[in-house]
Amino acid sequence: MRLSRRKFIKDASMSTLAMTALSKASPAAFAQTAHSSDEPQENAQAQQFSALADKPPVRPHPLDLDENFIRMPLAPEDAIYGRLQGAHIKEFVREIVAVSNKCRDDGIRFWGRMAGTKYDDMTEALVESKFRDFGLEEVHRQYFDLPPQVFPTSWDLKATGSGQTLDFDSVVPFPRSQLTPGPMDLEVVWVGLGTEADFVGRDVRGKLVVVYSWPMPGVVEHSASYNGALKRAADKGAAAVLLNVAIPGNFQTAVILRAGSLPAVSMGSEDTARLRQLLEQGPVRARLQITTETKPGLRDANVWGVLPGVSDEDIIVMAHHDSYFGGALDNASGVAVMMGLAEYFSTVPKSQRRRTLKFVTTAGHHAGSAGTQWMHDNRATFLGKTALMINCEHVSVVQAYFDRTKPELRKSTNIDARRWYVNGSDKLAEIVVKNYKTFGVTIYDVMDPYTTGDMSHCDHDAPAIQLIESAVFYHTDHDTPEIVPAPGLEAVARSFAKIIDQINLHDRQELLG
């Protein structure tokens, strides 16, 4: 029996997490186990490498990461796909992220390309303009009414103990957090990973519970989401929750979880370490306040553009456009590849396009995915002659590692592998996987059994493929163009272009699963 991705990671990781909990779960418990050493635990790692650090430095040799990413050369028979250039596609990424940055610069504290906001509308206008520039036909917006949207507007967290008061720059409310009933003055309790064992002997009723969560690989999934830590805190009577997804640095994060009906915030690792050190000195109280605004009457849109083909069948290339923070990986990278493909195929004569190509940036992924839900609801007619759907989502991100000597992330010259999905025949899967290999698109060893992301609403309604990777930078304020390698965009765009060309040699019936 094939395990789901969630269960596989959960089962494979919990033993490691349990070992991590020995040093992280409780400041008090940690102090009790530290008597065997005369040195503080936090110095142990530094001591391990002190002899190396004492060596005289050698001449440094800087590395230009952008110039050294792995890039596959084109075979002569694939020279036509050389027109899809990563540097050009990345300019689309920068243009889209600039919309998010304007939101931030306009003073919106919970910033990004949020569904239903004017910045979301600006992104749609940008895509619409590109489609017209490329000469696409039937360019239009398809609007959807959104349910009332909740936006955190202001928040604050201060911690006081042992004669000190700390402020924290990296605090962000969960996007779906409850607001606080005015300022809350709460005792702080550290519960480590938040397993049932971590709660033993701790009274959390009416208190602010701090959960330390191991990234798996980041904000999208982490130990607290697997082990039910937040629900456990709520069930045991906590008044509020503070979550740290233990990414090195001091990342601001948008955590898509609920803590029951509790107010909930996330905080970066450096700020969390400061809070933990304060707890190690004695009791700590926190002042927490979250204010939200509910906005009814908002709308979002699919933006469509069409390149007619010679038959009545079609291929749909989609990518959602809303985001938290800069959203370069999520999902300017996908929208940029989708636009790059639209531009590329606009230069192909209609007589050489067997099927109509429909390009769409889809509406409100973080607000219910109205755009792809509409496709599902109208699948009998809208998708009845669709030969392939391609979802472009989080398609290129630098491969990063945890440094072994200090709490830092280290980037590499490689590009993260993507989770991949094929709904269709063995022939379709053969075409897809072969072209990923041809163009150097790194993928996981086992296909996802289902899609995550925006296409999950309609992925069973027609032959479909997807690439997606929700890396450590996903849903953080470090999701910037700098972590989106141009060669990764290029490789994905080229592979999708050739997949389109090759499936056009096959009848739709041959592509169905």
Where are these regions (language model features)?
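Metal-dependent peptidase/peptidase-like ectodomains
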Residues: V310-D312, T362-Q466
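N-terminal hydrophobic or amphipathic helices/low-complexity stretches enriched
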Residues: E39-D120, A125, S129, F134, ...
